Design a protein with these regions (language model features):
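Pair of pore-lining "gating" transmembrane helices in MFS-fold secondary transporters
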Residues: 3-30, 34, 208-227, 308
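Conserved MFS/SLC helix-loop-helix module at the cytosolic interface between two early adjacent transmembrane helices
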Residues: 59-95, 271-277
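Paired small-residue
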Residues: 87, 98-106, 290, 301-309
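Symmetry-related core transmembrane helices of the 12-TM Major Facilitator Superfamily/SLC fold
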Residues: 164-181
């Protein structure tokens, strides 16, 4: 099994998944306004539209992870991409905020492409190269997630917001086909005699305190990274940006992705050499300091520069967590652990 070939194919799939999910970020609050929300309810529904996907994904992800351990990671990747083709593309046709929230909830229910691709590569890459492999893979979703808004802002500015959702649906269908014909997995399901429950799986992990700490760290990292996204356009507007608001918002969000591309692979190799836990601690400290500067930005340009610098640190965060998880997790339960 050529794990490097799968790595780059999964990288491209993750890039399109990340881009598809983030293309809507620059104008989500404006789309909510278009659907009829007014005043303070715009921020509320914008935040709900984004967080509802994360909520249902968090609840259902362990279920998909368990199925991946039984039937393979590739089928779960195909399922996620194909289902999201309709849940994301259908956002172009919603008549009001209620149906927007419903489809966003369903999008989270059927998600799971990224954690299953991560589990796939983690199960195939040699342990000594896990930092490099997972660091490289993470640049795909990070780059897509943070460069997607620039493309989304440009398309929304010129063609209208609803057409962006149709484009997203097309991207996700391409990812479905790409995964079917590109990803190779020699999966051997665990026999029922050797099958372990989730409780037994956790009992087999000796470093339970480390596992719990990594779960908390992962949750905090993703919460910090996504918390500002629903209202970033409104924040940039409050800093004085009036013209080309969607384009500027997309560029500022994407600045973080550009720097993450440069840093993730290199930092992944550095983590393999110096220890992923040391690199993770340094990256957390660095990101904390830069995030404070983001809050004190006085102009859109300053915010863009700070977001770029912040991205340099994020290149070591989730890859570092994934690499450490891979090292302490039994092979037979890697999809379930990564789904959490």
């Amino acid at each position: 099994m050529n794990w490097k070939r799968n790595l780059w194919i999964a990288w491209l799939g993750n890039f399109f998944i990340g881009a598809s999910l983030s293309l809507v970020v620059p104008f989500m609050s404006l789309y909510v306004e278009e659907l009829g929300a007014r005043g303070s309810m715009v921020e509320f529904y914008s935040g709900l539209a984004v967080s509802s996907t994360a909520l249902t994904a968090a609840l259902l992800s362990p279920v998909w992870g368990s199925l991946a351990d039984k039937y393979g990671r590739k089928p779960m990747m195909i399922r996620a991409a194909f289902a999201m083709t309709f849940t994301m593309g259908g956002l172009a046709f919603v008549p009001n905020v209620f149906w927007l929230i419903v489809l966003r909830l369903l999008n989270g229910v059927f998600s799971g492409y990224v954690p299953n691709s991560t589990a796939l590569i983690a199960s195939q890459a040699p342990k000594k190269h896990s930092g490099y492999a997972l660091g490289t893979l993470s640049t795909g979703v990070v780059a897509g997630t943070l460069m997607g808004p620039l493309l989304g802002g440009m398309i929304a500015q010129s063609l209208g917001m609803r057409n962006v959702f149709l484009l997203v649906g097309f991207f996700l269908f391409v990812v479905t086909l790409w995964t079917i014909f590109g990803i190779k997995e020699d999966f051997h399901p665990v026999s029922k005699e050797k099958e372990v429950s989730t409780k037994q799986l956790f009992q087999r992990i000796p470093q339970k305190s480390i596992l719990f700490g990594l779960f908390i760290t992962s949750m905090v990292i993703q919460m910090i990274g996504q918390s500002i996204s629903p209202i970033l356009t409104l924040y940039i507007r409050s800093l004085g940006q009036k013209e080309n608001l969607l384009l500027v918002s997309g560029a500022i969000v994407s600045a973080m992705g550009v720097s993450s591309i440069f840093s993730s692979s290199w930092l992944g190799k550095l983590g393999d050499k110096m220890g992923n836990h040391r690199l993770l601690l340094l990256a957390l400290l660095y990101s904390f300091v830069i995030y404070i500067f983001c809050a004190r930005a006085g102009t859109p340009l300053e915010l863009g520069i700070y977001r770029f610098l912040f991205g340099l640190g994020t290149g070591a965060l989730l890859p570092g967590v994934s690499s450490l998880l891979n090292k302490i997790t039994p092979k037979e339960g890697i999809s379930r652990i990564f789904s959490y």
